[in-house]
Amino acid sequence: MARSLVCLGVIILLSAFSGPGVRGGPMPKLADRKLCADQECSHPISMAVALQDYMAPDCRFLTIHRGQVVYVFSKLKGRGRLFWGGSVQGDYYGDLAARLGYFPSSIVREDQTLKPGKVDVKTDKWDFYCQ
C-alpha cells in the first residue's frame, strides 16, 4: 500500500513537469500580427533595459533580470499587444545564438531605437513554438 502511494506521488510529480511547455511543440498564439523592423524580423527595433525581474511562465517567454539589456525584435499587435519579442544581451553560449522569446513590454524601458518597427508581419506557429 505504501509503495503504491509513493509510485502514485512520483507519477503526479512527473506529470506536473511534463506539460507542453517542457516537452516542446506548438503553443497557443499570443497574437496574429506583429510589428518588426523588416519582413523577417531579423533586425532589432530597439534596445531596452529591464526595470524588474520577470520569470518566464513557459517556453515562449524569456526570463529577464532587472538591469539586463534586452534587444527588441518585434512588438505584438491586437490581443497580444502587451508583449514584445526579443533576446537578452549575453544570453548565449559560445557559438549558439541567443534565445528569442516574449516578455511584457511594461517591464522594460526602451533606451535606444535602432530601426523603426513599422513593418506589419503575420505571425505563424513557429513564432510560438517551444523546443
Curated annotation (Swiss-Prot):
Domain SH3: from-to ranges: 43-113
Protein location: Secreted
Database matches in Pfam families: SH3_2 (PF07653)
PROSITE patterns per record: SH3
PTM statement from Swiss-Prot or TrEMBL: May possess two intramolecular disulfide bonds.
Residues forming coiled coils: none
InterPro entries: MIA, SH3-like_dom_sf, SH3_domain
Tissues where this protein is expressed: All malignant melanoma cell lines tested and infrequently in glioma cell lines.
GO MF annotations, alphabetized: growth factor activity
One GO-annotated biological process of the protein: extracellular matrix organization
Keyword annotations of the record: Disulfide bond, Growth factor, Secreted, SH3 domain, Signal
Signal peptide, first to last residue: 1-24
TM ranges: none
GO CC terms, sorted: extracellular space
Disulfide bonds: 36-41, 59-130
Family: Belongs to the MIA/OTOR family.
Entry function: Elicits growth inhibition on melanoma cells in vitro as well as some other neuroectodermal tumors, including gliomas.
PANTHER family (UniProt xref): MELANOMA-DERIVED GROWTH REGULATORY PROTEIN
Record's subunit section: Interacts with FASLG. Interacts with TMIGD2.
The protein, known as: Melanoma-derived growth regulatory protein
Organism of derivation: Homo sapiens (Human)
